[in-house]
A protein has these predicted regions:
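General helical structural elements
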Residues: 6-7, 81
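Bacterial N-terminal signal peptides
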Residues: 7-16
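Beta-rich carbohydrate-recognition and catalytic domains
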Residues: 22-141, 147-177
Length: 177
C-alpha cells in the first residue's frame, strides 16, 4: 500500500505540477509546495528539476508567496499550478493554517500570474461568501485543483469538501465550479 501511495504521489507531482516557465527553461519541471505544519511553513515555495525526480529548492528554500498576504487563515496548503491556454499561470491552494486546527480550512485561494513572481489573488471563504446557506456550514475544503475544459472553453476548479450535516456521518463530496 505504501508503495502504491508513493507511486501515485510521484506521478501526480510529475504530471500536475509541471510547467514550463520560459522558452529558455523548456524541459524543466516546477514543483510548487508548502514545507510543513507550522504557520511559517504553510507558504508557497518553488523547486526546479531537469529530470522530474530530483528537485532543488529555489529562492534558498524560502517562500516566493507569503501566505499572510493572500489567505484569510494566513496559511496555504496543497498548492496546484496550471499553465493556461493563454500563457498565464493559475494556482489554487487550500486556505488553512494547521496550527488553528485540522478543520480550519473553510476556503480556497485562487491566483494568477504572467511570470510566476507577481501574483494576483482572490480568496473564497465559504462561511462569508455563502452566509445563510448550506455551503456556509463547510469546515474542510481540501486540495483544490484547476483544469481546462475545452468543450466549455473555461477553467474549472474542483475540490473535496466536508460539511456539517445532521446525523452520524457528515457529508463529504468532491465539487467543481
Amino acid at each position: 500500500m505504501r508503495k502504491t501511495v508513493m507511486t501515485f504521489f510521484l506521478l501526480q507531482m510529475l504530471f500536475t505540477t509541471s510547467v514550463f516557465c520560459n522558452k529558455h527553461l523548456d524541459g524543466y519541471y516546477l514543483f510548487v509546495y508548502f514545507s510543513g505544519n507550522q504557520t511559517s511553513n504553510q507558504q508557497i515555495c518553488y523547486a526546479l528539476s531537469s529530470d522530474g525526480i530530483d528537485f532543488a529548492p529555489l529562492n534558498g528554500g524560502h517562500p516566493v508567496i507569503a501566505s499572510d498576504s493572500i489567505a484569510v487563515m494566513k496559511g496555504v496548503r496543497a498548492p496546484h499550478i496550471l499553465r493556461g491556454t493563454n500563457g498565464w499561470f493559475y494556482m489554487v491552494a487550500t486556505d488553512m493554517d494547521w496550527t488553528k486546527g485540522k478543520w480550519s480550512n473553510r476556503g480556497i485561494v485562487m491566483m494568477r500570474s504572467q511570470n510566476l513572481l507577481d501574483w494576483e489573488h482572490h480568496t473564497v471563504d465559504f462561511h462569508q461568501r455563502f452566509a445563510g446557506t448550506e455551503a456556509a456550514k463547510v469546515y474542510a475544503v481540501w486540495a483544490p485543483q484547476t483544469i481546462w475544459d475545452p468543450a466549455a472553453q473555461k477553467y474549472l476548479i474542483y475540490f473535496s469538501l466536508h460539511s456539517e450535516k445532521d446525523g452520524q456521518y457528515p457529508q463529504e463530496a468532491i465539487y467543481y465550479t
